[in-house]
């Protein structure tokens, strides 16, 4: 059993885990338990956009008291690491507790003292907060070697879990893929690579169409922009297919994918061409469709009612026509993950697209998730007016 520390918007993060691993459940409001199959007993954190840290569950402690968890840690690891060769680097992160960093650090210091008397050298990563940041975990390589350990201690409703980290999100690689690409365009929106990963994973595990000559599943993005979704899909070893109304965007995506190919020293199966998503006929096969659709114009403050009616009507028309055009071109059961706009008002309420209640008429159904409702899949920052609402659909 594994535990995942979920990202800034936990509902989206747990939905991603459920689509990838299946047997997933909430443990606390910021964490999820994941049952992995025996043949692949780990969480591939570098493939997940919504998991900050992952760990293998080692101990379970009844109750909700930090002292009980602290005693268990000292008792278990003073025995497990006694007379161990080489220095152990240890960090401790405590989630859901009221204790401050000094209390968390104290547990590490007590353990360090006990291990010293049994001949084991321990270096403690200092706690500025009760939780080590993802950056601290990543830069100290915690969870990536036997002698570099982060204990992830999480308090949930049903007790306390102590897990050994199997790694933190690689923020350096994500930043390099985001900012290092040769072609970027703020006007068409900047889809974060993490969100692209989440959306691809929300399509679920993909398999090759047996009637095609392809050796990899092929993923289509019909609003390709600068190619962030295709870039992340290529890193997951999918064949990638992108179209866009603007020739410039198709060119930019080509440049970005060629850059990635050179950087990875790994060939990518790429298909790109111009095309209006409302009318294009795409090449086959298409094993999944993942896209950030047209979001309308950006707003720095909530628009007037008349402006909102205009923008909402325009985006709803484009995205409805796209879904209508796509439906006869894909097979029953094909996943379609689409980010569409939702507009936040001054009270924090959202206005949604009319098409959200009409997906059945357009030829699709919502994928039913056990842990979240479809209306919880809203991706936004507190200061954003236009949120991305993620639709996880399947072709009827």
Labelled PLM ranges:
Residues 1-77, 96-110, 134-150, 155-396:
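Class I S-adenosyl-L-methionine-dependent methyltransferase catalytic core
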Residues 91-93, 122-126, 161-163:
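A structural signal for short, well-ordered beta-strand segments and their strand-loop junctions
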Residues 78-83:
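Short boundary motifs at domain starts and secondary-structure transition points
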């Amino acid at each position: 059993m594994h535990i995942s520390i979920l990202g800034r918007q936990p509902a989206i993060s747990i939905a991603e885990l459920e689509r990838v691993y299946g047997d997933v459940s909430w443990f606390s409001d910021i964490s999820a338990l994941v049952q992995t199959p025996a043949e692949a007993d780990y969480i591939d954190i570098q493939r997940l956009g919504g998991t900050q840290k992952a760990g293998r569950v080692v101990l379970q402690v009844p109750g909700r008291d930090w002292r009980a968890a602290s005693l268990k840690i000292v008792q278990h690891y003073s025995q497990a690491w006694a007379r161990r060769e080489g220095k152990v680097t240890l960090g401790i992160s405590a989630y859901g507790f009221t204790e401050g960093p000094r209390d968390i650090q104290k547990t590490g210091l007590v353990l360090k003292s006990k291990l010293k008397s049994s001949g084991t050298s321990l270096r403690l990563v200092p706690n500025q907060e009760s939780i080590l940041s993802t950056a601290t975990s990543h830069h100290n390589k915690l969870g990536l070697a036997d002698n570099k350990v982060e204990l992830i201690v999480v308090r949930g409703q049903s007790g306390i879990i102590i897990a050994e980290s199997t790694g933190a999100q690689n923020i350096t690689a994500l930043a390099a893929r985001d900012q290092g690409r040769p072609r970027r365009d703020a006007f068409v929106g900047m889809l974060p690579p993490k969100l692209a990963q989440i959306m691809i994973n929300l399509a679920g595990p993909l398999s090759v169409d047996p009637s095609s000559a392809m050796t990899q599943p092929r993923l289509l993005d019909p609003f390709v922009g600068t190619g962030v979704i295709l870039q992340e899909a290529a890193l997951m070893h999918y064949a990638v297919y992108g179209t866009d109304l603007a020739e410039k965007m198709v060119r930019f995506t080509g440049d970005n994918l060629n850059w990635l190919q050179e950087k990875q020293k790994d060939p990518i199966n790429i298909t790109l061409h111009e095309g209006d998503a409302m009318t294009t006929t795409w090449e086959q096969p298409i094993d999944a469709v993942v896209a950030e659709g047209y979001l309308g114009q950006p707003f720095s403050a909530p628009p007037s009612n008349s402006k909102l009616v205009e923008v909402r009507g325009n985006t709803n028309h484009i995205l409805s026509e796209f879904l209508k055009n796509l439906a006869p071109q894909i097979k029953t059961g094909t996943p379609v993950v689409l980010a569409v706009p939702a507009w936040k008002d001054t009270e924090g309420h959202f206005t949604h697209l009319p098409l959200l209640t009409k997906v059945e008429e357009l030829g699709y159904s919502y994928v039913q998730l056990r842990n979240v409702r479809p209306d919880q899949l809203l991706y936004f920052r507190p200061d954003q007016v236009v949120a991305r609402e993620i639709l996880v659909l399947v072709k009827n």
